[in-house]
Each structure stands twice: as C-alpha cells, then as structure tokens.
Design a protein with these regions (language model features):
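Extracellular/lumenal and peripheral-membrane lipid-interaction modules
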Residues: 1-138
Length: 138
C-alpha cells in the first residue's frame, strides 16, 4: 500500500507543529528531497538548502543522510543535538558522517503504528512523498 502526501501538505503540517514554514521539494532522485529554511543573519535573511536522502528503511528505523555543504552540515549537527532534548528527540540518533537514524519504535505513538504496519520504503517524485507499507496480520 502507498500513502502519498504532497510536499505542501507536509510543509503545512510542520508549520502547524513548529510554527515555522519549511518548504520541501523533490530533490532529483527517488529517495532525495530538498528542504529550505530561512535564517536571519545580521541585517538580512538567507535561505539555506539541505538535501535529505532516505538511505534505508528497516524494522521501523529510517536512516537519512543530509548534505548542505560544510558550514550547513555543522549547523545541522548542532540542531540535532538541541532536538534531542525536545519532545520526540528520543527518535533521533546521530550516526557517523552526515547521517541520522530515526528510531520510530522509541516513540509510543509511532511504535503503536509499527505494531500494525510494516514500513517498507519512503521515496519521492515531482509531487509526492510516498510511504510504502503493508498491514500486519492482526
């Protein structure tokens, strides 16, 4: 089965939860999206882009690599460190290189969902983020 979400739907959800817009676009390959973020720097706002690639989906874990250039990657590592102390931070495990593991089973709500479905893949096309899953026998 597939769940298809438009990038606009995902951006609106993030904005409703985080209070900040986070535009998302197709990244040019079936497992990569481009995320952009406006950062206020001194007297002007600068848009920073980051490529996120889903490397692996298995057993409720999602391995993601990120690439935005040396300075951006450093800022992402700092943001990951800060996110670990926030609600949902238990899901995030920094890995070597520019990679993170999202351990969905460590979150009660996501864990309950994973009891009912097997997450197979997350991929992207020009319009949608596509979550491929199969229901588990109950």
């Amino acid at each position: 089965m597939e769940l298809r979400l438009t990038y606009q739907e995902i951006s609106k959800l993030i904005e409703s939860k985080a209070g900040r817009a986070l535009p998302i676009a197709y990244g040019g390959s079936s497992h990569t999206v481009r995320v952009s973020y406006d950062v206020d720097m001194l007297f002007k706002s600068t848009n920073i882009g980051l490529d996120l690639t889903v490397e692996e989906v298995s057993d409720g874990n999602i391995t993601i690599s990120y690439n935005g250039g040396m300075g951006i990657d450093f800022m992402v590592r700092q943001a990951i460190g800060m996110a670990k102390s926030r609600p949902g931070g238990e899901l995030i495990e920094p890995l070597d290189g520019n990679r993170i593991l999202l351990a969905l089973g460590k979150n009660q709500q996501a864990g309950t969902l994973l009891e009912r479905i097997e997450l197979r893949d997350i991929r992207f096309d020009e319009q949608y983020a596509i979550i491929d899953f199969v229901p588990k026998a109950i």
